[in-house]
Amino acid sequence: MKQIQLSKPGGLDNLKIIETDNPSLNSDEVLLKVSASSLNYHDLMVALGLIPTEDKRVPLSDAAGEIVEIGNEVTKWKSGDQVMSMCFPNWVSGAPKYELLSFIGDNQDGYATEYIAIPETALTKIPNNLNLKEAATLPCAGLTAWRALVDEGKLKAGESVLVQGTGGVSVFALQLAKTYGATVIATSSSEEKLEKLKALGADHLINYKTHPEWGKEVLKLTNNEG
């Protein structure tokens, strides 16, 4: 099978496509055929050496695919199930603990590979309304936005949400906020990107290059509530 390895952290030129054997399974693992992956800034930081990792690390934290084989102790999945990755595969339940927050793609091999053997608890079901490509974008950026707005923020219709920039978390936050009936204020330094945010539903747009005191603009739009 084909696989991408980071021969040594410190530059994109160190990413190499190699041929290697399909992985063997432990009893609690599944063999996942990776169908789609998405890139986020974490992956770039790993490749550039800004997040430490071992030589020959397989990068990428976000993916979706189909289970093609299961270990003899696996009970959660069966062959043919379509699933997606989770950012912290060792954090299964309970309060987060440092030793459980191993991030796939830097502390352990990630999804830049055709097949990966991974514990059954490291995957979750794809929502029925999403295809594999769409689901592959969710694990890190989508979940981060959800936790901030819904889980922690208890977002309600009619509230205002400020999204800064056009990174993955901001774009997901914009769409989630609109789904919940919130008013979204979006910032960027690019008029072209602001138009894309408008197309996604942003109610108010602020170019922080032409409006360097953009915070005051936000206060105006929210009756000084922020």
Sequence positions of predicted segments:
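N-terminal Rossmann-fold NAD(P) dinucleotide-binding loop
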Residues: S170-V171
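Residues at the starts of beta-strands that form the adenosine-phosphate
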Residues: K2, Q82, A182-V184
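NAD(P)H dinucleotide-binding glycine-rich loop of Rossmann-like/cofactor-binding domains
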Residues: C87-Q164
